[in-house]
C-alpha cells in the first residue's frame, strides 16, 4: 500500500523526469539559435528571410508548424471532444486552403517578390508592385501586421504560461517568462534561419505526438472498437453533418480563405531557394498537415471514451492532450509530448515575432533612414531588427501578464482580419494587371473594417437569425474583393510595367 509520502516522492520523481525532457528540448532550440547566428545574419535579407536559401523540406514543415500553433494539439482535440466529428470541417477547409495556397500563391509570390525590388516583407511587396511612392499602402499594411501580430504573439505566451501552470502546477508567470526567454533567444540571435530550422524540428515533434497519443489510447481502450464505443455513447459523435448547422459548417470550412493572406505563412514561400522546389515542399507540407490534423481529430474522439474509462474529471476540454499524455505514458515520454505542445506554441510565436520585427524594420525604420542607408548600413538594420524582436516580445509579455485580459477575445479573430484584408489583395497583386493603389488600400481597409463590425455588432445578433453567426472572414473577404475591383476600375490604371512584370512572372513560373 502506498503511503502519502511514497506517492508524493513518485510524483516528484516523475516531474523531474519530465523536466529533463523539457530541458533537453530547450537546449536544442538554444543550439539552433547559435547556429543561425553564425550562418545567416550578416545582412537584413539573411536575418529576415534566410537569404532566400531555405530548402523545400524546412520550408514545408516550418510553414506547417508556424501555422498550426497550439490549436492543433490543444484546441482541435478539445473541440472534437466537445462536439464530435462535425468539428472536422475546419480541418477540411484548412487543408484545402493550404493546398490551393501552394499552387496559386506560392510560386508567383516567390518569383514576384524577388523581381519587385527583392521585397522581404508583404507591405514592401505591395509598395513595389503598385509603385506606392507615398508609402501609404506600405504604412497601412505594416500597421495591420504590427498591431494584430503583437496581439497574436501575446496569445502564444499566455498558452505557454498556462501549460506550465496546468501540467506542473507551476506559477503562470514563471512559465510565461521561461517560454518567452527561449523564443526570444533563438529568434533574436538566429533570425529567420534559426526560426525555420527550429520550426522543422518542432514540426517533427508535433507529428510524432499526434500519431503516438491516439494509437496508444486505442491500445489501452478497445482498439479500433474504441470508435464503436464512442458512437454508442452518442450517435452524433461520428457524424460529420450532425451537431452543426449549415451556417456552422460553412463557417468552419471558410477558414481556408485565410491562408492567402497570413504573413507568417506565406513568408515561407518567399524564402525558399527556388520556386521549382515548391512541389516537393507542397507534397511534404500537405502530408504533414493531413496526418497531424487527423491525429488531432483522433485524440479528440478517443478522448470521448478515454475520460470516462479512466474516471477523469476533465474541466477544460483543451487540456485533453495534456491529461492523456500524463496518464498513458512514462514521465520521460510524457515530457516529450509536453514538449510537442511547447513546439506548437513556440513555432508560431517565433514566426510572428520575426514577421512583426521585419515590418517594423523594413516598413517603418527604412522610411526614416532612407533606401541608401539601408543598402550601406546593413549591420545597423540587422540590429534594429533584433531590437524590434525584443520590443514586440516585451509588449506581448506585458499584455499576457494578465491572462484574463479582454484582448484575448480579439485574438481569435486575427486570422479573419488578415484573411479579409490581405488575402484578396495578394491574389489581385499576383494575377490582375488592373489593380491600382487606391483599389488596394480601399479593399484592404474595407475587409478589415467589415471583420471588426461583424464581430462587434453583427455576431451578437446570431440569436435572432443564425446567418449573423457566420464566420466574419466570409463577409470581410467578399466585401474586400468587390471594393478592390470596383475602386481599381474607377481609378487611374497602373503603368505598362505591371503587365510586363506579370507576364515575366508567369513565364518564369512555367519554366520546368
From Swiss-Prot:
It comes from the Bacteria. The keyword Membrane applies. Disulfide bonds: none annotated. PROSITE patterns: NA_SOLUT_SYMP_3 (PS50283). GO terms for molecular function: L-proline transmembrane transporter activity; proline:sodium symporter activity; sodium ion binding. GO terms for biological process: proline transport. It catalyses: L-proline(in) + Na(+)(in) = L-proline(out) + Na(+)(out). The keyword Acetylation does not apply. This is Sodium/proline symporter.
